[in-house]
């Protein structure tokens, strides 16, 4: 961890998956890098109707990496690195305009009788919130900021193609209504925003809002539709980007628009149609780590950001962004992981010492020896900041990665040299060693990580060391952390060390050989190619 900006770049990843902690035992450098690739198949359960989170996977590697999810979403929306969606061409625009055409092809022209209506949700059905959700809020929506800086000023553009879609539906003789969970206090701003976005004909009588007090989202929307039907209107079509927009009946047909950027769970109403059971998100997903799947994957086949974040937090037992340090699926996994590797390292280090091989074990820093979760979630809300990261580093604020002090101690006691190898830069070296010394030391307080065997990356103003081969990652245009780490392991072995194991939470910590055993720790909170 971390490189400045922490962007996802490079060639498409392969699809082979390395099972956590199960690695080849071939000689140094003999491990095939093609096996060191992120998994691409996932099962993600949506939030329950009451908003609670289903049990997460016991293995963190089975949780979609949130950086990869965001990269996939941005590819799907044709979004820039700053989170601004492309307004004229993207996989999202292609999918949603095709859906609009399919609906128009099936909708009788003209309307076969009076008092037939099409009902549409507002946010991400009529008005497009993507730039707010990504660029302004980084997928962490603040209701107050949303209201004051986006809803009231009317800053949302129209969802691509929907202005023409609504006009065509109206021209065919159907009444058009907008139903929204926006509050009555936001009604005037919503009407003005719809007009500014290009919609004609919406009035206070056709844009219906309601208070969510003491009722669920489904109850609100179904109640508004029931009110229209009580006035003699037949709703032939209900369109929304959330299944909660569609549940509860009172519409002959429903159309779900794609939206992987957030998820609104809601209990259904009593007496809802049995067909509502089909109105659910998929749970099985295929996703490449680098975001490329967004070019070809339908929007609702991308893991939903809200559901993935909920799963990650449940895995770490996090409350308000702070991981549970006493009990969580992550701690359970790390306990089993540490038990296995303490014994393995005790055996292999002792064997190396008997053979006079100068055995060594290499450890990455972030989320291998030092746990960054609270910074990533509570402090950054999964929106990485190099400035804030440096504050945490310089103040040595990170706890030890659970159970890893025992792993390091076992290797040291069995005779292995403890080597630290991190993408943190030289200006963070002293603070990192100080942070490690708090958690990684022998009974007399002597630190296991020592300056002579601790390697940090150069700063942007430094020249890379002569031993670094900047082509290891296949990109000669620059020197990556992968280049630095692989080259440094090679240098250590050239100097006579035998690296019996290399521990890291990123596959880029492990690729490049010069280690008998690459060992991957779980980390769904960020991805470094």
Which residue ranges define each predicted feature?
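Asp-based phosphoryl-transfer active-site loop
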Residues: 114-129, 359-372, 420
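Short, acidic loop-to-helix structural element flanking the phosphoryl-transfer center
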Residues: 147-177, 184-185, 389-419, 426-429
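Structured segments of extracytoplasmic/periplasmic soluble domains
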Residues: 102, 106-110, 129, 133, ...
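Surface-exposed patches in mature extracellular/periplasmic domains of secreted proteins
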Residues: 110-118, 174-181, 206, 236, ...
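Non-catalytic pre-domain segments flanking phosphatase-related domains
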Residues: 7-15, 19-120, 271-363
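A solvent-exposed, charged loop/short amphipathic helix patch at secondary-structure junctions
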Residues: 134-153, 377-395
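C-terminal cap/substrate-recognition subdomain and adjoining C-terminal extension
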Residues: 32-41, 68, 183, 187-292, ...
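N-terminal secretory signal peptides that target proteins for export/translocation
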Residues: 1-5
